[in-house]
């Protein structure tokens, strides 16, 4: 299960959408897909300045998946059909958030000799193949290049999964504006918090799920690394062990704060995770009741 509160307009920006006009004017339909659930959120757009988007519906449909699967369970597609059928042809801005379980992330170092689009595509594919040789998937790769000399942040999603999603949504005349892994939304929300609270662009951005963490290191606006690691109920201990090792290898990262969604923090505080500083990222819209445990985020 992905654990965080949705933050429309912050974790998914208009600029990220392939359907920017719907993102500006239509209500949002958010589909959060994990191995064990399909969560469906509907948000009414706020038209007046200072008003917040209103959540008008939330449903959770249990799925029989495994945390080891590289694709969602087959039961997802019938469940998705049942959810979308009553909405067919209606005007929505559709946002699909996928568990990090189905994504692969990689921070590739700057290579001055890699210039053409063909060279970049080959470099990205080679990097992913080297890092994830055993997955055996046909991946759709998205790259977020940094500025000169900075790393390129890659994410890859199974092409078969994206194709089935497109077909399912097209069948109900609900074209997607955004399809993204959950960590992307976590990063967007953390970056927004950095700007609002006057933090520099430095920190560990953590996306927590029931069975694993996705952890990325940002220093001076450069995504230096990103990795996924399995966890259980003792996830805070696992995270602290990881960061302690990083302190030894990279002492300059010792003082970086940890950015966690308030829903994900699970009681993690600077006091309970000493010597690390924890920044609880809260929804800018005030969304987030304890009963909601959800997945989302974004990247600059």
Residue ranges and their predicted role:
Residues 1-300:
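Hydrophobic/aromatic-enriched cytosolic interaction surfaces used to assemble or bind macromolecules
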């Amino acid at each position: 299960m992905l654990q965080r509160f949705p933050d429309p307009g912050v974790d998914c920006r208009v600029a990220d959408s392939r359907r920017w006009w719907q993102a500006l004017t239509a209500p949002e339909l958010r589909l959060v897909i994990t191995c064990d659930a399909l969560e469906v959120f509907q948000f009414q757009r706020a038209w007046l300045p200072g008003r917040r988007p209103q959540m008008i519906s939330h449903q959770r449909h249990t799925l029989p998946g495994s945390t080891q699967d590289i694709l969602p369970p087959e039961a997802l597609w019938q469940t998705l059909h049942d959810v979308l059928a009553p909405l067919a042809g209606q005007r929505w801005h559709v946002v699909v958030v996928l568990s990090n379980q189905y994504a692969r992330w990689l921070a590739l170092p700057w290579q001055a000799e890699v210039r053409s689009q063909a060279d970049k595509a080959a470099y990205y594919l080679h990097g992913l193949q080297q890092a994830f040789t055993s997955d055996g998937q046909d991946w759709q790769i998205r790259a977020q290049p940094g500025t000169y000399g900075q790393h390129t942040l890659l994410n890859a999603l199974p092409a078969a999964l994206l194709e089935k999603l497109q077909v399912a949504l097209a069948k109900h005349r609900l074209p997607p504006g955004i399809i993204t892994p959950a960590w992307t939304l976590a990063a967007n929300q953390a970056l927004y918090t950095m700007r609002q609270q006057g933090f520099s662009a430095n920190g560990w951005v953590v996306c927590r799920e029931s069975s694993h963490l996705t952890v990325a290191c940002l220093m001076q606006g450069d995504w230096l690394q990103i990795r996924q690691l399995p966890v259980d109920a003792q996830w805070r201990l696992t995270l602290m062990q990881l960061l302690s090792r990083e302190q030894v290898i990279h002492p300059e990262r010792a003082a970086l704060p940890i950015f966690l969604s308030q829903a994900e923090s699970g009681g993690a505080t600077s006091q309970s995770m000493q010597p690390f500083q924890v920044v609880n990222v809260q929804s800018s819209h005030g969304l987030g009741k304890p009963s909601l445990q959800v997945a989302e985020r974004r990247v600059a």
